Design a protein with these regions (language model features):
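Mid-chain, well-packed structural core segment of small domains
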Residues: 79-98, 104
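HotDog/MaoC-like acyl-thioester-processing domains
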Residues: 1-14, 96-101, 105-173
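Well-ordered beta-strand positions in beta-sheet-rich domains
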Residues: 18-23, 89, 137-141
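Hot-dog-fold acyl-thioester-processing enzymes
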Residues: 2-85, 147-173
Length: 173
């Protein structure tokens, strides 16, 4: 594919298309800020003494912090990717420590037109930590915009359920 995957139209995507993001180093301030925003002050993330005696020997990043940062690392084109539709099979595979750099590797696993204006794209989503080892893995579904010419022609099957952001042929904000 010549167009970067996260800037492509739905029709330009194929199963197996993949991407990898730049890195981001996790700092102590990230753990403190995330704890303050979410109220998750578990000592594994917030108490160095407690965490030092625990199974990881030191504080580690919140799993949800890693998942949240992974979405921010992905260079998403808002004119193409309309909405996050879902996350399934989320697994926190290994800890990420303060000072460790994460990146994301994603690959298209399925494509389904859901409306003349959009399609549903499933991605194998991996947050990578030290040495490229998988720290978090999930199945991510995103609502992807179809090319305007395709939408105008009305191609695609209406496969919409009650949770879909598409109703009456329109993508809802």
């Amino acid at each position: 594919m010549s167009t970067p995957i996260l800037s492509a139209w739905f029709e330009e995507l194929s199963e197996g298309d993949s991407f990898r993001t730049r890195g981001r180093t996790i700092a102590e301030a990230d753990l403190v800020s995330f704890s303050a925003l979410t109220g998750d002050w578990h000592p594994q993330h917030a108490d160095a003494e407690w965490a030092g005696e625990g199974p990881f020997g030191e504080r580690i990043a919140h799993g949800m912090l890693l998942l949240s940062y992974s979405l921010g690392l992905a260079p998403i084109d808002p004119e193409r990717i309309l909405a996050l539709r879902g996350l399934d099979s989320v697994r926190f595979k290994r800890p990420v420590r303060i000072g460790e750099t994460i990146s994301v590797r994603g690959a298209v696993t399925s494509l389904r037109p859901v409306d003349p204006a959009a399609g549903l794209v499933a991605l194998d989503w991996k947050v990578l930590g030290a040495e490229g080892r998988v720290a978090v893995r999930a199945e991510l579904q995103a609502l992807w915009r179809r090319q305007p010419s395709q939408a105008a022609e009305g191609e695609g099957e209406a496969a919409v359920d009650e949770l879909s952001p598409i109703q009456d042929g329109r993508v809802l904000a």
